[in-house]
């Protein structure tokens, strides 16, 4: 780093190099892997907690975005050191990208002649020139390094590399256009798989231990192993056999749970309820929800597949049971809503994906966890759809591998919100009949904690009422 001892990043690296144990996060581990191991100090062993999130975190770290706002901000930041025509051309190209994105239907982009890809190609060429101009005369200059110029060049290089990657449309990447809730569009690129990156730049470099309460999907470790780049044929069972140099042996060990799930919790599945559709949450589901919440006396964490469903459920509950406070994600800071939920046992908290993981509310505050539907990925999710197609093209079952695997992991995480300590009791209610009627139901249930299971609503209601006595 040109700033030497004044650089906080360099100081942190030096401190890490002298440590016996370094605690970091998934994002930093991913950045280290993407940069060939040049970020973290040399190490013999890596222990990765919450490893069920590893693929998503590595995917996020390896993904890039471009938008008119990003291009405009980067161009203005660099304007002082650019020739006037280059700076003006970059700003004009931001406008061109805006028009190209507006003309593109949100979704995956696969053809090089697509207008938005052609726009990225022009942007790439302009950014390449800008990077060169931002770095010229550095070698001969006796002036102190200009920090702002260095940062502007780094930002412009990021735009160049991202545009270049998008234009390339490599088979290993997925490129797509998205639209935000406010109507702003942007273009994204993400790896089709991060298995190779993990295998070569993490597992091959040091002994690695992955830990999580939800690595066992469908009753075994094969799904997570495949996602992180390990082959089922490399699994070691029993006494360790000889491993070929080309193989990377791995073991899956289920160490059990301190909880007696079959005695502490009930899984209720609404078998008689209508299958979820596109028209929002059904009246029958809302009626089931209300009866369960009434029996629990509030004390409910509601995990919904969409913000629309969460809001509809909250409005229904407030109308049907005005004496029970209902908090809904989006009505305040999530941390504040969670604190209020934990402080008042009669309160309900409804929300979406942010609540499925990491919420830890032990005790009587949470006796009922409601899941409105099986959390399959959206069918129009470009990255998930591309991964599913890749599995199909390789002769596998794309739905079970990608969509059902995604749902199984979220169900395991969501259901895990109920039992947080040895004296917790309660009910997980899945208001989607497919969990017991569809062919993939067994796979999904095998991924969840082994609660005692029923499809009898009155039995679940009775259990909740007895807990309140």
Predicted regions and their residues:
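ASCE RecA-like P-loop NTPase motor cores
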Residues: 1-469
């Amino acid at each position: 780093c040109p700033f030497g001892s004044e650089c906080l990043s360099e100081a942190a690296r030096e401190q890490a190099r002298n440590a016996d144990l370094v605690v970091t996060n998934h994002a930093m581990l991913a950045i280290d892997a993407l940069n060939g191991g040049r970020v973290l100090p040399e190490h013999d062993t890596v222990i990765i907690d919450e490893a069920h999130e590893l693929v998503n975190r590595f995917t996020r770290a390896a993904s890039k975005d471009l938008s008119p706002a990003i291009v405009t901000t980067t161009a203005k930041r660099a304007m002082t050191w650019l020739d006037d025509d280059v700076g003006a051309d970059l700003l004009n190209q931001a406008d061109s990208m805006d028009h190209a994105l507006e003309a593109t239907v949100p979704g995956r982009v696969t053809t090089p002649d697509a207008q938005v890809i052609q726009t990225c190609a022009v942007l790439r060429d302009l950014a390449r020139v800008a990077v060169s101009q931002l770095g010229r005369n550095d070698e001969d200059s006796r002036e102190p390094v200009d920090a702002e110029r260095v940062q502007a060049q780094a930002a412009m290089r990021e735009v160049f590399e991202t545009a270049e990657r998008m234009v390339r449309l490599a088979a290993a990447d997925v490129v797509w256009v998205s639209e935000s809730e406010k109507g702003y569009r942007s273009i994204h690129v993400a790896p089709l798989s991060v298995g190779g990156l993990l295998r070569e730049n993490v597992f091959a470099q040091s002994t690695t231990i992955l830990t999580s309460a939800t690595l066992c999907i469908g009753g075994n470790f094969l799904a997570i192993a495949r996602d992180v780049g390990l082959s089922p044929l490399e699994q070691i069972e029993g006494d360790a056999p000889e491993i070929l140099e080309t193989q990377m042996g791995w073991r899956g060990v289920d160490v059990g749970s301190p909880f007696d799930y079959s005695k502490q919790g009930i899984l209720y599945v609404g078998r008689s309820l209508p299958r979820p559709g596109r028209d929002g949450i059904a009246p029958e589901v809302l009626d089931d929800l209300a009866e369960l919440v009434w029996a629990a006396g509030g004390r409910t964490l509601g995990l919904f597949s969409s913000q629309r469903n969460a809001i509809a459920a909250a409005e229904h509950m407030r109308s049907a049971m005005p004496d029970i406070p209902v908090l809904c994600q989006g009505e305040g800071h999530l941390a504040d809503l969670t604190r209020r939920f934990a402080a008042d046992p009669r309160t309900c908290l409804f929300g979406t994906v942010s609540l499925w993981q990491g919420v830890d509310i032990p005790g009587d505050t949470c006796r009922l966890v409601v899941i409105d539907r099986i959390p399959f990925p959206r069918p129009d999710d470009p990255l998930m759809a591309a991964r599913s197609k890749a599995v199909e093209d390789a002769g596998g079952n794309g739905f079970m591998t990608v969509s059902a695997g995604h749902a199984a992991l979220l169900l395991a995480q969501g259901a895990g919100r109920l039992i947080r300590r040895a004296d917790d009791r309660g009910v997980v209610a899945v208001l989607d009949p497919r969990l017991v009627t569809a062919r993939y139901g067994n796979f999904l249930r095998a991924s969840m904690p082994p609660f005692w299971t029923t499809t009898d609503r009155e039995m679940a209601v009775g259990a909740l009422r007895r807990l309140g006595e």
